[in-house]
Every structure is written in C-alpha cells, then in structure tokens.
C-alpha cells in the first residue's frame, strides 16, 4: 500500500461532531468535537477500507444520493444507523437480496470489519458511510426515498443529564419519517428498559403528526422478530440479564 492509501482510512478517524437537542427534541447545536477512542484500527481493517471503499463506501455530500444509480436497481433502501462491527447488517443484506442496505457507523474498526465480512460473503446490495448520521439524514437522503430505518442498540446515555444526547428525539423521528416511503418502517431495539420507554414515548408523541402507526398488538413493544440477527450488543445484554425491547412503526 502507498502512503497515500494509508491516510484514507486514518482520516476517517478524525474529529467528528455530536449533536445536541433541546428538551422538546429540536436540533440545538454541535456541543463539542471529539476524537473517537474506538480502539486500534488493525492493519487488516485499514486495508479493507483503503482497498474496498470505492465499491462499498459512500462519502458525505451536500445533495441527495441517487440510490438507483448507486445500487443499479430500484429496490427498497434500508438505512441502519450504528451498525457496530457490521455482522448483523451483512447478514440481513445476504438474506434479503431484493433489498438494498445502507449502513452508517462512525467507528472505523467497525467499518473495516463490516467491509471485510461483506467481501467474504460476496455482498452486492450494501453500502456504508463513516460520518455523522444526523448530517447524512439532513443532506444526503431525499424525502420519501427509504424503505426503512433500523437503529439497533444505540448508546442509551444512562445519566439523566445526558439524555439529550440520545439520538431518538422527536425531531429525529420527524426527520426519519420524512425520508420514508409510504409503508416504510422504523425499527428500534434496545436492551435498556429506560431507553425503550423513552423511545416508545417519543414515537407516540409524534405518531399522529408524522403519520406512523405501531404494529404492536399491545400498543407498545413487539416480540423479538426472527428476521433481526442476533447482535453482539444483544448477546452482551442477555449475559448481563437485560431484557430486549423492539419497536416497529409503519408510515401510513
């Protein structure tokens, strides 16, 4: 590898910004920039990013992505925010060749691992982004262009003073719903009950305004769906004795 190539994966580890929201969920400001302390980016992960980004990677841009041109078809696009090491995302892409998957992850070791697994499985219907999800939603995703949004085991930000950092806020749900086609879904999963209740409250608070409905027969959570692969974070939660809560809403 040339020195120029080596800098590509490394520059993705540069400072990123974290969004802050007001108590009613409106976007407020970027509260701080921080260097991601994500552990060592292995040489193999670095090589996967350097050598395969042109096939699997998408970069931030100031206009919406042209999904038919990117994927070469008009299949539904499913966006997953925070795919971790990417194993479950790759598995879903493999199991659903009639859908296109787009994953966002800011941790470069996870991005590198995801690309390696996608390459191993010969996945063609997957693209990944290493950038702040709020900016991607705002600038790169056209309205009514997504078939679904997946958010599995996001950071729960346990302390009450940090709850404003939680990604699931009213404005986030409103923005996501704008990006969904009619019949598109929102699927959240968490192993923290407090965050599960927070997610449910947020979804219920805006569902009439944005036109989404809960498919749960009990009006809250759904049983764990078989189509969602078991993630590393879910396994960790199970070992700690945590419950698992899934939410699934459909856009009218």
Swiss-Prot record:
Annotated Gene3D superfamilies: Vaccinia Virus protein VP39 (3.40.50.150)
Keywords: Methyltransferase, S-adenosyl-L-methionine, Transferase, tRNA processing
Residues the record marks as active site: 155
EC number(s) stated in the UniProt entry for this protein: 2.1.1.33
Residues holding substrate: 159, 191, 231-234
Any one GO molecular function term: tRNA (guanine(46)-N7)-methyltransferase activity
InterPro entries: SAM-dependent_MTases_sf, tRNA_(Gua-N-7)_MeTrfase_Trmb, tRNA_methyltr_TrmB_bact
GO cellular component, one term: tRNA methyltransferase complex
PROSITE patterns: SAM_MT_TRMB
KW DNA damage (keyword) present: no
Enzyme class label: transferase
Function: Catalyzes the formation of N(7)-methylguanine at position 46 (m7G46) in tRNA.
Family annotation (PANTHER family): 3-DEOXY-D-MANNO-OCTULOSONIC-ACID TRANSFERASE/TRNA GUANINE-N 7 - -METHYLTRANSFERASE (PTHR23417), PENTACOTRIPEPTIDE-REPEAT REGION OF PRORP DOMAIN-CONTAINING PROTEIN (PTHR23417:SF14)
Protein family: Belongs to the class I-like SAM-binding methyltransferase superfamily. TrmB family.
Protein name: tRNA (guanine-N(7)-)-methyltransferase
Species name: Actinobacillus succinogenes (strain ATCC 55618 / DSM 22257 / CCUG 43843 / 130Z)
């Amino acid at each position: 590898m040339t020195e120029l190539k080596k800098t590509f994966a490394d520059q993705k580890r540069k400072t990123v910004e974290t969004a802050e929201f007001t108590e009613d969920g409106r976007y407020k400001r970027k509260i701080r920039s921080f260097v991601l302390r994500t552990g060592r980016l292995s040489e193999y992960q670095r090589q996967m990013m350097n050598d395969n980004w042109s096939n699997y990677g998408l970069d931030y841009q100031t206009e919406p992505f042209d999904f038919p041109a990117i994927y070469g078809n008009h299949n539904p696009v499913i966006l997953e925010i925070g795919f971790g090491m990417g194993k479950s995302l790759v598995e879903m892409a493999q199991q659903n060749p009639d859908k296109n998957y787009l994953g966002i992850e800011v941790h470069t070791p996870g991005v590198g691992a995801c690309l390696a697994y996608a390459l191993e499985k010969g996945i063609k219907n997957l693209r990944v982004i290493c950038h702040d999800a709020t900016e991607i939603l705002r600038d790169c995703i056209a309205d009514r262009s997504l078939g679904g949004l997946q958010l599995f085991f996001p950071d729960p930000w346990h302390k009450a003073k940090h709850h404003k950092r939680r990604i699931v806020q009213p404005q986030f749900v409103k923005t996501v719903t704008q990006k969904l086609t009619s019949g598109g879904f929102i699927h959240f999963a968490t192993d923290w009950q407090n965050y599960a209740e927070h997610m449910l409250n947020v979804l219920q608070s805006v569902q009439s305004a944005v036109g989404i409905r809960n498919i749960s027969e009990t009006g809250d959570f759904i049983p764990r769906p078989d189509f969602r692969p078991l993630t590393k974070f879910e396994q960790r939660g199970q070992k700690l004795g945590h419950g698992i809560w899934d939410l699934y809403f459909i856009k009218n």
